[in-house]
Amino acid sequence: MTSTLVLASASPARRQVLRAAGIDPVVRVSDVDEDAVAAALPPDTAPATVVVELARAKAAAVAADIPEYAADCVVVGCDSMLLLDGELQGKPHTPEVARARWAQMAGRSAELVTGHCVLRLRGGAVVAEATDCSATTVHFAKPEPEELDAYLASGEPLQVAGAFTLDGLGGWFVDRIEGDPSSVIGIGLPLLRRLLGDVGVGVAQLWRHPAR
């Protein structure tokens, strides 16, 4: 019975979502060039497909390099991006880009899309795959100039999709959301449960203390 979930992500937030939900994931970070994967897709690729393909690339890269778990495990890859004005926005990386993003999205709403890929490994091979995308509408507040300065100086928004977090300092500047909160953080529990079921794994198998 599968009892190991390998998270193909360096995101502390994704790891914490799983831990809070009873799963202690094994963390393995892929070396996937996300920009190269996205650039290889046709220009008119739907946003949901873009994030799913990125999630699949991450999961596949990790699945190919975990011999110690390959006998029986599931590998989960995720990728999140913010869809605003018809354009996908990833991590800003610099304060200047993050400031420009906030100038664009403050006081408005945007859609946070998160691609998920679940691979089931058995006997060293991938025997099942399930993918899907979750979408959550985020309504942003208008930070005061000094608040935005402080937020950018914290460094938090530089390495997260859309230049904001829901579960950190950025939560002060989110008025409300429509959809799954865990998906905004980076890994949607309701969707992940369904995808695990699609590859034949019940979520309770993965809990630290299975229900009796």
From Swiss-Prot:
Q: Which cofactor does it need?
A: a divalent metal cation
Keywords carried by this UniProt record = Cytoplasm, Hydrolase, Nucleotide metabolism
Q: What is its EC number?
A: 3.6.1.9
Intracellular or extracellular location(s): Cytoplasm
* GO CC terms in record: cytoplasm
Q: Which residues form the active site?
A: 79
Pfam families named among the record's database cross-references: Maf
Give the reactions, separated by semicolons, that this protein catalyses: a ribonucleoside 5'-triphosphate + H2O = a ribonucleoside 5'-phosphate + diphosphate + H(+); a 2'-deoxyribonucleoside 5'-triphosphate + H2O = a 2'-deoxyribonucleoside 5'-phosphate + diphosphate + H(+)
Q: According to the lineage, what is the superkingdom? A: Bacteria
GO terms in the biological process aspect are: nucleotide metabolic process
Quote the function comment for this protein: Nucleoside triphosphate pyrophosphatase. May have a dual role in cell division arrest and in preventing the incorporation of modified nucleotides into cellular nucleic acids.
Q: This protein is called what?
A: Nucleoside triphosphate pyrophosphatase
